[in-house]
């Protein structure tokens, strides 16, 4: 029986440990699928059409009210993981969010929550946040579409994954204004993180599969830490040539955040964020959010 694993962005470092878990054979009989945006990915999990999703942890709440029916299994990496990139013609400076006033910024459903909240906290208004031109359909590669739209000046900036940011910078089009994982405030870093998620039904009926998935991510973390170049061979199978040549370096940068455990404080900060957004109606306990094998 095939195990269906879906992620909302493929040509990206964001969910790469899930990609590696499948492609390196740590989760036997697993098939990887791309299903964008993450809100749609979690709806498919809720409807029983997927076994596991790698996605933004807080976005589970778009499909599972107050965490009822789903659980986080493990972290694919720690901290919020998107980049804010602005076109160079605006002369943006790293860390200076005031440059965004009046600009058109592209962001995806789910990830956009983190951008809106950090701008609210910084007191930055008058930013036009909307979808990325071209990022439509379930197979969209959001970061690459964002970098393309920026180069074509269909956008003034974007909030997207590390691959989109790297491409925009290397092409001389964009400047990274904020790397949330490394430069955000402690609150911002704690808004969300990439997680592996499954339904309560899977945990109830096939707990051994859920446990195997956690072990597969841990094994992928270990393999990528030992040799980030393993990512290149995977990229060559799944990515366009340029992005395949970049992925190992992006993974090398991310390996310090490759810890699969989910701490209590991580859940607490994520749930505060979700409550601020109105996605979570009440405080919930750690065990209502995270499944831990016996």
Specify the residue positions occupied by each region the protein language model found:
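Bilobed "Venus flytrap"/periplasmic-binding protein-like clamshell domains
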Residues: 2-25, 30-35, 82, 91-167, ...
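A structural signal for short loop-to-beta-strand junctions that line the ligand-binding cleft
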Residues: 3-7, 69-76, 104-105, 179, ...
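Pocket-flanking alpha-helical
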Residues: 17-20, 36-70, 82-90, 116-118, ...
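Short, surface-exposed acidic
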Residues: 29-32, 126-131, 239-252, 281-287
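Hydrophobic/proline-rich hinge and linker segments of small-molecule sensing/allosteric domains
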Residues: 73-94, 189-205
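Pocket-lining segment of extracytoplasmic ligand-binding domains
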Residues: 139, 145-236
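Secondary-structure end/capping motifs
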Residues: 204-281
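Conserved C-terminal helix/tail region of periplasmic/extracytoplasmic solute-binding proteins
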Residues: 274-294
């Amino acid at each position: 029986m095939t195990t269906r694993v879906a992620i909302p962005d493929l040509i990206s470092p964001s969910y790469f440990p899930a990609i590696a878990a499948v492609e390196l054979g740590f989760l036997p009989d697993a098939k990887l699928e791309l299903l964008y945006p993450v809100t749609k990915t979690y709806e498919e999990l809720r409807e029983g059409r997927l076994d596991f999703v790698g996605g933004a942890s807080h976005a589970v709440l778009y499909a599972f009210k107050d965490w009822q029916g789903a659980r986080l299994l493990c972290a694919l990496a720690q901290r919020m993981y998107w980049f804010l990139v602005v076109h160079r013609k605006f002369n943006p400076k790293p860390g200076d969010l005031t440059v965004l006033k009046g600009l058109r910024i592209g962001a995806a459903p789910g990830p956009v929550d983190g951008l809106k909240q950090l701008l609210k906290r910084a007191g930055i208004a008058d930013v036009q946040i909307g979808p990325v031109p071209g990022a439509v359909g379930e197979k969209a590669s959001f970061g690459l579409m964002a970098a393309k739209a920026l180069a074509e000046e269909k956008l003034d900036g974007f909030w997207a994954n590390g691959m989109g940011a790297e491409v925009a910078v290397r092409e001389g089009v964009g400047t990274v204004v904020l790397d949330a994982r490394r430069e955000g405030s402690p609150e911002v870093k704690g808004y969300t993180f990439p997680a592996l998620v499954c339904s309560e039904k899977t945990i109830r009926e096939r707990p051994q599969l859920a446990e195997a998935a956690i072990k597969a991510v841990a094994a992928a973390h270990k393999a990528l830490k030992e040799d980030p170049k393993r990512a290149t061979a995977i990229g060559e199978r799944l990515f366009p040539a340029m992005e395949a040549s970049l992925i190992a370096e992006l993974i090398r940068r991310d390996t310090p955040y490759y810890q699969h455990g989910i701490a209590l404080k991580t859940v607490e900060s994520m749930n505060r964020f979700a409550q601020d957004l109105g996605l979570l109606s009440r405080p919930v306990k750690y065990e209502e959010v995270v499944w831990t094998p016996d």
